[in-house]
Every structure is written in structure tokens, then in C-alpha cells.
């Protein structure tokens, strides 16, 4: 149900209808509240996006760092810096942290190579984090290929918690697999969207209407044998967002992660 609510809210927020919407929310006590959602034309705000819209960080206390990454897109270029460069700059600001909470809940993917550059900081040797089943070009032969993460840059010996949700897709799910399925991090929040497939796009025309057809080129499986498609990656610590959390602008996922760090990880 949380997944459906999140999807409905997302659809409202990106709607092309230039009007405000009023959402009625009922809490456990039966009280109802009206939430007004204002339409914003994304074309009006895109040119002014700052670095913080893509990557942001802060120290939550003297030991816990918080790193938010909203995309792995290779098209991001801020004064010559790509996403990986922005992440590296923010990691330097969190150098004193003993534990790191990585928030990728709003990240729908991009370039897995950029994701590998961050994940590679937290391993000391190559490690397999999943497999993909592909078809050889021009043949019916199916081939299993291991997905292997290589160490990248300086090793960062930090305890890791990753915040996940239904908007996590594609190469961002691969990033989560790199650290969760290799027992390098625990995840908190909601199950991811379950969408990879490494699709290829084809433009087709039906009469005067134009469509884009996306065709999957592989099937991805996690180290535990579970398929990723349409299933997603379940969190180690699931969290339910209540109507009261929405009304009061609370972040129960982050709260749970901080509680876990304080009570379970050596700081």
C-alpha cells in the first residue's frame, strides 16, 4: 500500500495539469487532513539546478555522515564535474565520519560505472555482486555473466547504511546490490522498484502516433538467486511511512537508520 501511495503522489507531482491538487489524508485516529499539492513546471526550474539537487551531504553528529545521491546520470555536468566528481567532493566533507548513511531513495539510475566508483571505495578486493543472463548477438545461445565490483581509489573503512525505496531502479539497484548483496551494507526503508533489463529503445509509428518501445537485453539475478525484475530488493530493516509522518514532514527511514547505527554499529 505504501508503494501505491508513493506512486500516486509522484504522479501528482509530475502531472502536466497546471493546477493544484488537494489530497485528503486520514490518520489512525480517524482524523482527516487536507494536503495541497502545487503544480510546478519542471522546465522552469531545471536551468537553476545546483549541485545540491544531485548530491548533498552533512554530518548528522560527530560520528555519522549523511550522503544523498539523486541520480547516477552521465549527462550531469556542473562546471565540468560529473556525478562521480560531486560524490568525491562530498566524501571529503565526511572524512571524519565512522558510519555513513547513503540516501538513494530518489535515484532512478543512470550509469552503473559512476555508481561503481563510489561502491569501490568500500571493498579491498574484487567481488561478484550479481549475474546477468544475455543472448549472444545473432545466436540463440544464452550466456551467464558475473557482475564484478573492483576496488576504486582509497579504501574507506566505514559502517554503511543505505536508504532505499520504490523509486530506486536500474543502475541504482545495481549500486545497492554492490554493497548489500556483498554484506558490506545494510538497507533501511522500502523495497526497490525492481526494474533493470538494460533496455534498448526503438521508435515506432502507428498512424500519426509515435511510440518508444523499450526492449530488455538481459535478465539480472542477485547473489541469492532471486531475480531483480518486478521484485526489487527488499530492505533489511523495513519502514512504513504513516500519514502522520507525511503531515509532520518526518523521515522515518532516516530516523530508523540513525537508531540502528547508534544501537548496533560500533562507533
Model-predicted regions and their roles:
Residues 18-20, 32, 61-64, 95-99, ...:
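Extracytoplasmic
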Residues 109-163, 167, 197-207, 217-221, ...:
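Gly/Ser/Thr-rich loop/hinge elements
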Residues 100, 169, 182-196:
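Short, well-structured beta-strand/strand-turn elements
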Residues 3, 77-85, 109-116, 154, ...:
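Soluble non-cytosolic domains of exported or imported proteins
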Residues 65-68, 100-103, 159-164, 186-189, ...:
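Structural recognition of the beta-strand scaffold that forms the well-ordered cores
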Residues 1, 101-103, 179, 187-189, ...:
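Conserved PDZ fold ligand-binding element
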Residues 84-91, 115-119, 157-160, 172-176, ...:
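Extracytoplasmic/secreted envelope proteins and their assembly/folding machinery
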Residues 1-99, 106-108, 120, 124, ...:
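Flexible, low-complexity junctional segments that flank or bridge functional domains
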Amino acid at each position: 500500500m505504501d508503494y501505491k501511495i508513493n506512486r500516486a503522489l509522484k504522479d501528482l507531482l509530475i502531472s502536466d495539469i497546471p493546477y493544484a491538487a488537494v489530497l485528503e489524508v486520514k490518520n489512525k485516529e480517524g482524523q482527516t487532513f487536507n494536503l495541497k499539492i502545487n503544480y510546478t513546471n519542471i522546465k522552469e526550474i531545471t536551468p537553476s539546478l545546483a549541485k545540491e539537487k544531485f548530491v548533498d551531504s552533512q554530518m548528522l553528529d560527530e560520528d555519522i555522515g549523511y550522503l544523498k545521491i539523486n541520480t547516477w546520470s552521465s549527462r550531469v555536468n556542473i562546471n565540468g564535474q560529473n556525478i562521480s566528481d560531486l560524490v568525491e567532493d562530498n566524501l571529503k566533507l565526511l572524512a571524519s565520519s565512522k558510519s555513513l548513511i547513503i540516501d538513494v531513495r530518489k535515484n532512478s539510475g543512470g550509469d552503473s560505472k559512476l555508481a561503481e566508483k563510489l561502491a569501490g571505495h568500500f571493498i579491498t578486493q574484487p567481488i561478484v555482486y550479481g549475474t546477468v543472463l544475455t543472448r549472444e548477438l545473432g545466436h540463440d545461445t544464452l550466456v551467464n555473466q558475473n557482475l564484478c565490483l573492483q576496488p576504486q581509489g582509497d579504501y574507506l573503512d566505514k559502517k554503511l547504511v543505505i536508504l532505499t525505496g520504490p523509486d530506486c531502479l536500474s543502475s541504482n539497484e545495481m549500486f545497492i546490490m554492490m554493497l548489500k548483496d556483498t554484506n558490506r551494507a545494510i538497507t533501511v526503508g522500502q523495497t526497490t522498484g525492481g526494474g533493470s533489463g538494460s533496455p534498448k529503445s526503438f521508435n515506432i509509428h502507428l498512424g500519426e502516433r509515435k511510440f518508444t518501445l523499450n526492449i530488455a537485453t538481459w535478465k539480472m539475478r542477485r547473489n541469492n538467486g532471486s531475480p531483480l525484475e518486478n521484485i526489487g530488493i527488499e530492505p533489511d530493516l523495513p519502514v512504513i511511512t504513516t500519514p502522520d509522518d507525511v503531515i509532520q514532514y518526518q523521515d522515518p527511514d532516516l530516523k530508523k537508520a540513525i537508531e540502528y547505527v547508534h544501537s548496533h554499529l560500533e562507533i
